[in-house]
Amino acid sequence: DRYAIEASFLKNSKKRTLKGIANFGIRPTFHKNSEILEVHLFRFKLNIYNSLLKVDFVEFIRHEKKFSGVEALKKQLKSDIAKAQKILN
């Protein structure tokens, strides 16, 4: 399965490196089917939309899966984020 959650570094055009967790997949919990790359950055509040960015996948965390609902997904994301933070620190 190529859809996965990965610990990742994101670099912007100013070469600033940010830590996060990336999901490449189709968001099955939300009944979507088009591929998308989403990156959740840790402790980051600035607007970087329409910026040139590079995502470096560091380590596989788990395959993407469908959850019973948003609350189950949020619970799993907390665990995923904790794993990614350990990997990236």
Q: What role is predicted for each listed range?
A:
Residues 1-89:
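Phosphate/ribose-recognition catalytic cores of enzymes acting on nucleotide-derived substrates
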